[in-house]
Regions:
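Hydrophobic alpha-helical segments with strong N-terminal bias
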Residues: 18, 22, 42-43
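Short acidic-aromatic low-complexity motifs
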Residues: 12-13, 33
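Short beta-strand-to-loop capping motifs
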Residues: 7-12, 55-58
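An amphipathic, aromatic/His-enriched active-site/gating alpha helix that lines ligand/cofactor pockets
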Residues: 24-37, 47, 56-90
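Short, conserved charged micro-motifs
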Residues: 13-19, 63-65
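Glycine-rich beta-strand-turn "strand-cap" elements at beta-sheet edges
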Residues: 2, 9-11, 38-49, 76-107
Length: 107
């Protein structure tokens, strides 16, 4: 499994619009990507101007294909709520309970 960690600075007072953008524009796009497994989004408490999105992928190649293909659409959608350019870092997943959780929910 592979992960992409995107950190961003949200414009002031855009927390609700950020959540709507994730739900209505970004998640539908991600769900169409080959190898996509999950997206976890965090917003810092308080001012709510720091956000992190972690996407999980079957393989490194799936994440790379997304970043070279559809990711610019995500950046464009986020431009209305994000200051600057999001910072992307990639990681190999060494441990996760995601698949165990999914199996329990399906049972």
């Amino acid at each position: 499994m592979f992960s992409s960690h995107v950190s961003m600075h949200l414009k002031p007072n855009t927390r609700a619009e950020f959540a709507q953008t994730i739900e209505n524009e970004i998640l539908p796009l991600l769900r169409k990507q080959h190898g996509f497994q999950d997206e976890i989004v965090f917003v810092a408490p308080g001012s709510g101007t720091e956000g992190v999105a972690i996407s999980l992928w079957d393989k490194k190649e799936d994440a790379e294909a997304y970043h070279s293909g559809s990711y610019p659409e995500v950046v464009k959608a986020l431009a209305k709520v994000v200051d600057g350019t999001p910072e992307v870092r990639n990681f190999e997943v060494t441990h996760s309970t995601l698949q165990e959780t999914a199996a329990r929910v399906a049972a």
